């Protein structure tokens, strides 16, 4: 079954929830970037978090970029999500594997380190808006929760999970974002918090066949209402035409060097690792148009 998310609301219409099964898109990212376990967990969680944020905050042609700028061994992680629920991303150091924690789980916090989480929203205004918060946990879900509270003033709870198999394949990936709407009472918040704390590890649930609808019922109750079900996917908007335009911004001397010394050029998209080859003649055309 393809990856998808569901949007749900509780019976009182005071709690909004988005849940997602993202195994395929995280698997796609893992294969494209050849990530090892710790890098897979960090990139995967950031992709899921960015996807959930886009589903919660964006509309029409909006897009957002999440920058997880930790000082840990994986380096920076950047993901860009669109309102149509497509997402792309990359991690600075894809080949990081760390000793597991005592509970056997990947030490995501150690892989990430501290510093900053930034979210830039481009909503068609004159300037994109960037919110920045310190990395408070490094486990990523808590950091998204902190961002929503501080930068968006939205009381929320975020859960993110990626299960990496011993052979580096992705066994499961998914998550949720719960938002308290203005009418939510302290009692409701306490009850839903209790339900979330009682959940087994999210990876365990997804490995056992939990669907986004099932997860919504576990968190909001079986009387919750599913408002929407939408496909999600890893997708990059790079193209040879875009890279041709980038080449056209180079100095003529640089293009001439590529033509005369290298007899061509190969550009690689950092988000999806797609390769674009330009022949000598194609570079000459770029140079001609640039002049």
Swiss-Prot record:
Keyword line: Chaperone, Cytoplasm, Disulfide bond, Redox-active center, Zinc
Record GO terms (molecular function): protein folding chaperone; unfolded protein binding
Protein family according to the UniProt entry: Belongs to the HSP33 family.
Post-translational modification as stated in the protein's UniProt record: Under oxidizing conditions two disulfide bonds are formed involving the reactive cysteines. Under reducing conditions zinc is bound to the reactive cysteines and the protein is inactive.
Name the record gives this protein: 33 kDa chaperonin
Pfam families: HSP33
Broad class of where this protein is predominantly found: cytoplasm
Domain of life: Bacteria
HAMAP family registered for this protein in UniProt: HslO
PANTHER family: 33 KDA CHAPERONIN
Function per UniProt: Redox regulated molecular chaperone. Protects both thermally unfolding and oxidatively damaged proteins from irreversible aggregation. Plays an important role in the bacterial defense system toward oxidative stress.
GO cellular component, as recorded: cytoplasm
GO BP term, pick one: protein refolding
Paired cysteines (S-S): 236-238, 269-272
Subcellular location per the Swiss-Prot or TrEMBL entry: Cytoplasm
NCBIfam families: PRK00114.1 (NF001033)
